[in-house]
Amino acid sequence: MSTIHENVKSLQKKTISLLRETQNADGSWSFCFEGPILTNAFLILLLTSLGDNDKELIAELAEGIRAKQRPDGTFANYPDDRKGNVTATVQGYAGLLASGLYSRSEAHMIQAERFIISNGGLRNVHFMTKWMLAANGLYPWPALHLPLSFLVIPPSFPLHFYQFSTYARIHFVPMAVTLNKRFSLKNPNVPSLAHLDRHMTKNPFTWLRSDQDENRDLSSLFAHWKRLLQIPAAFHQLGLRTAKTYMLDRIEEDGTLYSYASATIFMVYGLLALGVSRHSPVIRKALAGTKALLTSCGDIPYLENSTSTVWDTALLNYALMKSGISDNDQMITSAARFLRERQQTKVADWAVHNPHAEPGGWGFSNINTNNPDCDDTAAVLKAIPRKLYPASWERGLSWLLSMQNSDGGFSAFEKNVNHPLVRLLPLESAEEAAIDPSTSDLTGRVLHCLGEAGLSSDHPQIEKAVQWLIRHQEEDGSWYGRWGVCYIYGTWAALTGMKACGVSQNHPAVKKAIRWLKSIQNEDGSWGESCKSAEEKTYVPLSYGTLVQTAWAAEALLQYEKTHHQAVTKGISFLIENRHYEGAAFSYPTGIGLPKQFYIRYHSYPYVFSLLALSTFMKMSEKEEEK
């Protein structure tokens, strides 16, 4: 056995041992789901405005924010954002100030203030942050009403509520209620931010969108909006009642809305605006559920937007089985049991566009019962040995197949939620957040699941999905990944999915993708891509390689190249060097919630994807030796 193979086996053994030690008693794994400072800042604002005296929690949240502030006073959404981000800096500044632990006169606060003012002030922050500031009396509400009658119009209307994505809806409802009621939680302990912007605007277009949208043709959208505003007042009141019911019906057992901290925080404002007492059980439980999401990410206090328990457990269990751990091993069976218990069995919002399917999918977080998605479902189906729970497994597969979009691709949460009018909304990131279209990463990952499940390559749904991928390949040979960073992620998902479904190495799309991956490899054997790719919609290299992206690229190449190919061996060599399991290569965020706003560091990813790449390398090496 060569040195590289010995080192691979040694690293596999070490990683497997670590995962045995860190598995929870219920079979799950709990790794940090680390996003931006938004959650810490927003909870501080809410708690301080409510007069919540949980000083220890507020201090921890503020500590987490301060730890992310850079020496120049700015905050950024990802490490190589050299200039800083005005929205993140406003969030951090407002959160620190509202905590009562920092004053405007401190040097780091003065630096942040100067950066914000020099970048146009509060008017240039993302509209969700403007909303949060307005809900706390720190920014004026826009001269705009959002017609909540929108919630009660039937699906036959050209534009209706369920043509928005599920993650847009769950945030839109409390935001719209609070905005329409012009509700603000004002507390003298939340200092004014008037010094950051002397010309705060009520202009609805400036309030909702960025300047780059000025020249968009919105006439068709406004025509439908005008019709909504002409609906009788009684329907608007019905809309308010419907909004309240919509929120209350989607509260999870722990009190959170859809298990999201952000949506739950917004819901508290929405319910208060509707007259619900701050001392009511629903609000007390919502606050308790949100507070419980506080964790420690590398010794830094952080409020997770949700747990990632189902996702992490599914990915890790699959990676362990691929690394040679028997599916009878207690580590595997206990994780499978945990996952089986979280299969969703109720008809929820996904059924609006998919009314004939039986439930059976899985969601992302530990307590999610309302919001299954295709990515988690595909991951869980690969992570549960079919023989253990055959009925559950078949039900999950049936649900997943039913979620294929009419264009042949797969999206995250719902089916055929890609209406062109919604794309026209004058909101920042509407293209990313308001719709849920087919994506290359979801389509590739579902294909991988279907291929591993034994569906034949000529299965009509597989053929449609493969054709979707081929149609959506970029000119350079890559694929854009929506939920990971970014072109490396999309290309890995597409290639592994197509290989699992029998697409030949001689296919032009495969050849083109392999060429592209080789062309962007770094001299040290690594691959690294910036989060900026998601903003520019073109590949932007990092100045260094990351462990996770190198694992993606290496595994993608291994689908179609020999293990002794130079690009493969250099990539694997990078993965087995201990120094890459710390520092920037280890910690760079490679997940995406919302481009420009919410990048994610999944603390499980280095273990998941290095294991997968290394196990693929070892299995292919063994096959090549046999030949």
Predicted regions and their residues:
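Preference for long, amphipathic alpha-helical scaffolds in soluble/luminal domains
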Residues: 1-627
